[in-house]
């Protein structure tokens, strides 16, 4: 049986640094657990532009379509701000998402007990928090036509963006949310603005249809997105899986991210339609950006990238036990007080570099055997 295939795109800024720690962990799984991967590497973002004049080469795109999963570090940096919009580093990531048709963006928001005091909310509100936000990624107001800025008849201008969703676009992301809920606590909350938007009415009706016809065993609730934002701050532990559209998902997932204490801790997955092996096309990446201000200094927190690989183990490689092993290793390291610079607080801890955090996670993995 062939080894699972993984394409690594380290990208820009701190991307190569945090990805280096993931590659060490991949090596650990091969050596200590007999779990081997066919790993290939390529360029994306600014690094690809510097080498090829494009943020994503056609050959890289073709390889991404062939592998079981893609793991990306980060893209972008101030040196590329002068580039035309069509070749900015971020366009490489957007092309991956679009051409792989990655329509379901998974953003977990988990608050590790050791970091509960880093949250902007009180410990008793966020302790034990474990939410999964499923954001529709390829449709909605970011992609709808018509769009643009146009002159009006009074010497001014007006801007237009179009929120557009089809039945199938809503149903497929709803199915992703219900499938995830079955693996978790079996609850889905769908968020929209059905009180003021026709697209919200359609969203609510289609999510309800998927529930009634395909997932009646999963508990479903509906909530207006503005109330959802308030509830995330008021009582976030009421949620298990949240499913919402592109715009609201963009906002709500960032809101949920700050409940956890540090963007350096948060992984993400973008999933598409099932491949021949029954598993979805997938791109995994940390939520944080390229952080050019600390690149090359050994200060970056690699945990978000490490946990992104854990998501790949679970959702692309069907290795849930190994994913849990890696997640528990991270939890152990944090409980032991090991901290990169972004996690250092008044209570102190053991300060470590990027590679030092990788060392600690590898030691915890060894201890798990």
From Swiss-Prot:
Coiled-coil annotated spans: none
GO cellular component: cytosol
HAMAP family reported for this sequence: LeuB_type1
Enzyme class at the top of the EC tree: oxidoreductase
Alphabetically ordered keywords of this record: Amino-acid biosynthesis, Branched-chain amino acid biosynthesis, Cytoplasm, Leucine biosynthesis, Magnesium, Manganese, Metal-binding, NAD, Oxidoreductase
Intracellular or extracellular location(s): Cytoplasm
Pathway info: Amino-acid biosynthesis; L-leucine biosynthesis; L-leucine from 3-methyl-2-oxobutanoate: step 3/4
Pfam families: Iso_dh (PF00180)
Organism: Cereibacter sphaeroides (strain ATCC 17023 / DSM 158 / JCM 6121 / CCUG 31486 / LMG 2827 / NBRC 12203 / NCIMB 8253 / ATH 2.4.1.) (Rhodobacter sphaeroides)
Obligatory cofactor(s): Mg(2+); Mn(2+)
Reactions catalysed, as given in the entry: (2R,3S)-3-isopropylmalate + NAD(+) = 4-methyl-2-oxopentanoate + CO2 + NADH
Protein name: 3-isopropylmalate dehydrogenase
Gene Ontology MF annotations: 3-isopropylmalate dehydrogenase activity; magnesium ion binding; NAD binding
Annotated site residues (Important for catalysis) in this chain: 142, 193
Gene Ontology biological process terms in this record: L-leucine biosynthetic process
Residues that, per the record, bind substrate: 97, 107, 135, 226
